[in-house]
């Protein structure tokens, strides 16, 4: 039996389609920001008092021969600090070391965060733990003030990101920590350069800053944050790497409560590919340099206002990660309404957000709402969607009327031309109402899957 000969014209056309979608993988922090992403990179900022940041080139990853891959964030004075970490069972060495030092210190007296990109220091055994401790120890040594005692816990939080299962070139890293310290500064360029140094497959540095006031006074406070992540993003307590700094005077216990709440509504509400990293960490440092009354309990008059500020700020930071999803062409908001509980709503939204079939349909601009319904139906919600009461819509971002796809379990006659127009946009919303009984709503943010995602991750270790 003979095989059919391939259609040369079809093969040629297919190759052109694939080659037009794939970009060459480049070294972390190479500065080549896609034109469409430049609008997300700030050209200026107002940064919290008493913090300085800097970076240095180590060459952790062999392909990175000249771009900074070691980042240092410091405070002139000791900070209250809190963090949320991954729940992946294979937790990276820096996660273990940082969690332990925060616990031993009671979230007090933290001076710095040290971050390397290019190697995750995950699944590296006892040697990896010692390497993470060495990073903390060498960072602590840069400060001239004496620690509480020779046996005091480390004062520097450690983060790593990159390839799993490989040991750090620890001597190279520790030899460059003094260089990063010497490069410290408080200008916008310092902050932007440091945000770039924590990148891996990111196409742009993710940095934000803002000023705000609290009800108790007219004093101006400041907050700044940087984050990294473009792949292996799916929430489980925290996700990716994030560092937030503020000059508000706030004690550890209320700060920890605020971060836990903020992370749940932001970093825990995004998904790029459904993978939860071994290294996920989001930390917040508060040095009180702006002065004012110390927020020492959750009953303080400024507590709720500060929680809202940090939550909104965290949501905006988390959205930047989704906008830089590996190979992504769309930013998608998933809104689930009328669920029996917030947990149910989040599980349904998460199920839709991580569905490869939903994400590839969005990339192909295909209004295949059946895939959305399928993901809704197999979610792990304790109280699932009511099939005969479920409705699905596309909501355009231009303010025009939503396009109903399914109403009370009955398919609508879809205007395919309008659906295609909505799906052409960079931003869109998928709205899923899971019953007709008023209930709980939630938001989740995700992106599409393109050919480029496969290319980047097939080539990640090189």
Swiss-Prot record:
Reactions catalysed, as given in the entry: N(2)-acetyl-L-ornithine + L-glutamate = N-acetyl-L-glutamate + L-ornithine; L-glutamate + acetyl-CoA = N-acetyl-L-glutamate + CoA + H(+)
Keywords: Acyltransferase, Amino-acid biosynthesis, Arginine biosynthesis, Autocatalytic cleavage, Mitochondrion, Multifunctional enzyme, Transferase
Residues of the active site: 239 (nucleophile)
EC number: 2.3.1.35, 2.3.1.1
Cellular component terms per the entry's GO annotation: mitochondrial matrix
Pathway stated in the Swiss-Prot or TrEMBL entry: Amino-acid biosynthesis; L-arginine biosynthesis; L-ornithine and N-acetyl-L-glutamate from L-glutamate and N(2)-acetyl-L-ornithine (cyclic): step 1/1; Amino-acid biosynthesis; L-arginine biosynthesis; N(2)-acetyl-L-ornithine from L-glutamate: step 1/4
Coiled-coil residues: none
Entry's Gene Ontology molecular function annotations: glutamate N-acetyltransferase activity; L-glutamate N-acetyltransferase activity
Binding of substrate, residues: 200, 228, 239, 326, 457, 462
Top-rank EC class of the record's enzyme: transferase
Site location (Cleavage): 238-239
Site entry: Involved in the stabilization of negative charge on the oxyanion by the formation of the oxyanion hole: 161-162
Any Pfam family the entry gives: ArgJ
GO biological process: L-arginine biosynthetic process; ornithine biosynthetic process
Compartment(s) where it occurs, according to its Swiss-Prot or TrEMBL record: Mitochondrion matrix
Cited InterPro entries: Arg_biosynth_ArgJ (IPR002813), ArgJ-like_dom_sf (IPR016117), ArgJ_beta_C (IPR042195)
Domain of life: Eukaryota
PTM (free text): The alpha and beta chains are autoproteolytically processed from a single precursor protein within the mitochondrion.
Record-stated family: Belongs to the ArgJ family.
Additional note from the record: This protein may be expected to contain an N-terminal transit peptide but none has been predicted.
Assembly, per entry: Heterodimer of an alpha and a beta chain.
Classification via NCBIfam families: ArgJ, PRK05388.1
Main function: Catalyzes two activities which are involved in the cyclic version of arginine biosynthesis: the synthesis of acetylglutamate from glutamate and acetyl-CoA, and of ornithine by transacetylation between acetylornithine and glutamate.
Protein name per its UniProtKB record: Arginine biosynthesis bifunctional protein ArgJ, mitochondrial
